[in-house]
């Protein structure tokens, strides 16, 4: 029945990886089931037969589908069904999209869909890597025109040792979470989060991962040669060469004059009459070809910018190749919020607001990832007004989620631990004006906002991008690219880090890959630029985190108790903890490992609650004095609660120094009195003395003790 069923097996960084094809999804253009350890991912690639009209880009969609059955979970929603993709799924889709997109024919406009469905997850074998390699295999053996293959790998750094495909335990300890993708010759995608890793170590990790990637690429080529389908012939949507040359001859001087400014708005304003004149002259001759005419002008702008850079060493705004746009940084500009910072670089401006919350406000993650909660959250918003446009706001898209995650990754390594700073932290970056590198401005703005909020970060972090122009063997890098250099260039290499090292990388390419020399130069230039931004602007705005939190931020104290004592703090039906919260006006969160977090507006309320909890979890000590509440009166004495759930007896003879006839002559139910523990018998019963407590306190006052 399955006469085309084939299984191919190889070793990938010491682990077996198998590819099954010809049994499932036989109507897709290319289909493969990837087995990597016990991780299983089904990957399908399909393409439309006809091109889509009226567009000037490849309509490629890449979807990484998380299925909770893959980790033995039932979705928590009312419908018990997977909903919209999680942020992690979106980020995984983008990681696969970036290396495969540049390898499609530039003049192809057919819809292409790549779907990776996660069927099972082995914690030691990352499904994103299985999906990426599976996507490359599916496209390679399909009938879809594509100039691959590529492959990807995870790289870690544990105790100074570079590790390929680290397992779950190693990933927890790793100072580096690096994903590298490449073709047979070049590195084509880098994404990383790191604990201040130096440039040389990062480059070594990239190249070590790339060497393993090349082996997988060679294997995919062998499979393609054996079972690959012939590629279908598509209708080329390349613009007419003669038409472009005619438009170029007529409009190039006008385009040069329009592009030669550092102001995006002026540039756009200058280009409008050029578009108007183009359509007035050519629409009649080329009816229904408006999109192609616009693409000719776009291509002409690209030609002008690239020739300036490669031939004249000239940037559109007149800067040098390593020169950063004018910078500005401000903090504390928004009242009542917990922290705020605004970072401006040329016409790019980002305002970041930091908010501190309790541990219970941490984000709950319902996905296939090992992580279930997140205490640092960074979100990025780029409204239409930031680029002078009008369009409805429909919530964050893939780009916004990706930029937010990059800035989040850059700051996580410098955040204080939960024990040092028991808060949930949320940063929101609002892009006020955009002309390139808004994600890197978000990193800078987040650092400013966190320091303004009084978060004791280990070191300030700055972000900067590096661009690239290539032509044959010629290439040139430039620091701090603005919009047109991003649009018309070949690379956007984003690097966030401290003075000590790198904390985050994201590399976007429009070419087939980079050589080690280009990567090394990009690291060197971004390192120098980061230090300049920190020293000249950010640290002058705020040299160190504020010593105190905002008066509007919740105050927090934490302690650790024996997990076996948790039930005593909570009490029967939660009565004890509810009583503490009500009496002290606090919120209390208790983790399973015994960590206790107490928050309130007033720090003194936190201290009072902590003292009460300590009396609950610590066994009473003979000779110690406690403030207790009288709970019951008996003929022979009074029962006093010295801590929730801990009650002792004050015998009538121990109520006062003088003789007491009736207990009620001295105390009443509800009275707060000082008592001293005089004895704890073998049955755990506590004997108390008010008389001895008073005597001891008076002796202290007189300095006798």
Where are the model-predicted features located?
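Long, basic N-terminal domains or extensions that often function
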Residues: 1-235
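Extended amphipathic alpha-helical scaffolds
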Residues: 1-48, 56, 233-370, 554-568, ...
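Glycine-rich, flexible beta-strand/loop modules in the N-terminal catalytic cores of phosphate-handling
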Residues: 28-113, 118-120, 125, 191, ...
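Conserved phosphate/anionic-ligand binding catalytic regions in large, soluble enzymes, centered on
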Residues: 30-32, 125-143, 331-354, 435-455, ...
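Conserved helix-loop functional segments at active or binding sites
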Residues: 98-106, 141, 333, 358, ...
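Flexible, glycine/charged-enriched surface loops at secondary-structure junctions
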Residues: 106-112, 147-149, 216-234, 265-266, ...
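Mobile "lid/hinge" segments at catalytic clefts and subdomain interfaces of large enzymes
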Residues: 143-259, 450-547
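Single-stranded RNA-binding regions, centering on S1/OB-family and related RNA-binding modules
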Residues: 552-558, 563-705
């Amino acid at each position: 029945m399955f006469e085309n069923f084939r299984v191919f097996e190889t070793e990938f960084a010491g682990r077996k990886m198998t590819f099954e094809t010809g049994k499932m999804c036989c109507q897709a253009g290319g289909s493969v089931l990837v087995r990597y350890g016990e991780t299983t991912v089904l990957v399908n690639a399909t393409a439309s037969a006809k091109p889509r009209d009226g567009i000037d880009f490849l309509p490629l969609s890449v979807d990484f589908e998380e299925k909770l059955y893959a980790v033995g979970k039932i979705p928590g929603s009312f419908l018990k069904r997977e909903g919209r993709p999680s942020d992690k799924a979106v980020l995984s889709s983008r990681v696969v999209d970036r290396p495969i997109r540049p390898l499609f024919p530039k003049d192809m406009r057919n819809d292409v869909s790549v779907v990776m469905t996660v069927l099972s997850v082995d914690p030691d074998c990352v499904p994103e890597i299985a999906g990426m390699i599976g996507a490359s295999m599916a496209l390679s053996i399909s009938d879809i025109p594509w100039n691959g293959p590529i492959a990807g790998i995870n790289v870690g750094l544990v105790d100074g040792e570079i590790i390929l495909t680290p397992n779950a335990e190693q990933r927890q300890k790793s100072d580096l979470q690096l994903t590298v993708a490449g073709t047979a010759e070049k590195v084509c995608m880098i994404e990383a989060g790191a604990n201040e890793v130096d440039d040389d170590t990062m480059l070594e990790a990239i190249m070590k991962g790339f060497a393993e990637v090349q082996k997988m690429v060679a294997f995919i080529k062998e499979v393609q040669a054996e079972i690959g389908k012939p590629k279908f012939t598509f209708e080329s949507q390349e613009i007419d060469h003669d038409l472009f040359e005619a438009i170029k001859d007529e409009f190039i001087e006008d385009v040069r004059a329009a592009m030669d400014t550092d102001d995006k708005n002026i540039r756009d304003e200058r280009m409008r009459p050029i578009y108007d004149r183009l359509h007035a002259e050519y629409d009649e001759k080329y009816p229904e070809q408006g999109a192609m005419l616009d693409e000719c002008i776009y291509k002409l702008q690209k030609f002008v910018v690239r020739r300036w850079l490669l031939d004249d060493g000239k940037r559109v705004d007149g800067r040098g190749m390593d020169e950063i746009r004018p910078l500005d940084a401000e903090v504390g500009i928004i009242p009542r919020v917990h922290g705020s910072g605004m970072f401006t670089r040329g016409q790019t401006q980002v305002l970041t607001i930091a908010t501190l919350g309790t541990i219970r406000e941490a984000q709950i993650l319902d996905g296939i990832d090992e992580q279930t909660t997140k205490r640092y959250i960074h979100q990025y918003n780029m409204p239409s007004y930031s680029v002078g446009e009008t369009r409805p706001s429909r919530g964050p898209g893939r780009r916004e989620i990706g930029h937010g995650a990059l800035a989040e990754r850059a700051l996580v390594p410098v955040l204080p631990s939960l024990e040092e700073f028991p808060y949930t932290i949320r940063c929101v970056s609002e892009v006020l004006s955009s002309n390139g590198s808004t994600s890197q401005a978000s990193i800078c703005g987040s650092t400013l906002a966190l320091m303004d909020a009084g978060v004791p970060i280990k070191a300030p972090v700055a972000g900067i991008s590096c661009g690239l122009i290539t032509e044959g063997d010629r290439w040139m890098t430039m620091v701090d690219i603005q919009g047109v250099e991003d649009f018309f260039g070949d690379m956007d290499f984003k690097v966030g880090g401290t003075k000590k090292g790198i904390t985050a990388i994201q590399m976007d390419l429009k070419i087939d890959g980079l050589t080690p020399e280009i990567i090394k130069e990009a690291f060197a230039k971004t390192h120098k630029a980061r230090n300049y931004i920190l020293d000249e602007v950010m640290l002058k705005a705020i040299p160190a985190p504020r010593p105190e939190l905002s008066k509007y931020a919740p105050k927090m104290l934490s302690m650790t108790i024996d997990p076996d004592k948790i039930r005593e703090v909570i009490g029967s039906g939660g009565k004890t903890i509810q009583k503490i919260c009500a009496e002290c006006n606090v919120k209390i969160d208790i983790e399973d490992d015994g960590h206790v977090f107490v928050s309130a507006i007033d720090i003194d309320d936190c201290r009072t609650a902590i003292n009460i909890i300590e009396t609950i979890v610590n066994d009473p000590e003979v000779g110690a004095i406690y403030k207790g509440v009288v709970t019951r009166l008996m003929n022979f004495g009074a029962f006093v609660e010295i801590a929730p759930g801990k009650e002792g007896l004050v015998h009538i003879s121990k109520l006062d120094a003088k003789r007491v006839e009736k207990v009620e002559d001295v105390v009443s139910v509800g009275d707060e009195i000082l008592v001293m523990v005089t004895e704890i018998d073998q049955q755990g019963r506590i004997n108390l003395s008010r008389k001895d407590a008073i005597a001891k306190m008076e002796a202290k006052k007189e300095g006798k003790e």
